[in-house]
Amino acid sequence: MNVPKHVAIILDGNGRWAKAKGMPRNYGHAQGSKNVERICKEAWRMGIKYLTVYAFSTENWNRPDDEVNALMKLLRNYMKTCLKTAAKNDMKVRVIGDVTRLDEDIQKRILELEEATKNNGGLNFQIAINYGSRDEMIRAIRKIAKDCVDGKVDPAEIKEETFEQYLDTKGIPDPDLMIRTSGELRLSNYLLWQLAYTEFYFTDVPWPDFSKEELEKAIETYNHRDRRYGGVKEEEEQNV
């Protein structure tokens, strides 16, 4: 089986999953957080080298205050458990997004987590927190503009590779496969630049129920995709 090098996931459906069980939305987020750890282990076991998950978007601040506060509390706790998981499984953890809006204690925990795992050689695990792709690109453009004014960058020499050096995902290969759970068929401002040639897989399964078998099913579907990157294969050219 051809295993994608980089898988990106939109972790959707936690709240609806909890509501269907007669539980509060926060319960769903907590269970979804636990499932992230399980899928990280399975991804590495399958041979996936990079896993990026959409944990909290720039638009999620618009949710009710009690839900946002619960998510921030969950995030604080997750930073602790993730450090233990990373140490146990040799994971390298990196947070993408504008963390400056997060409380200082969360920012500190993120820095500690990244520093403690930076030399690990296992799964490269990226967590998108306060992330929005449009916001990411605007921040990148502002940095490039400043460097142009400062004479560090020649505007005429800016290429795709130049722009990518200013993105949160600098140094990380573009995803090969993007998975979205819980039946929604949109990208929700997630990795818009990086997903240019990524294969998409949508499933009705909510994130807390997304299992090893579901991940295997997504990869099996990926194996039946014909990735052309805008071109055509040799046999197709011969048949034109």
What are these regions (language model features)?
Residues 1-240:
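Flexible, compositionally biased loop and terminal segments
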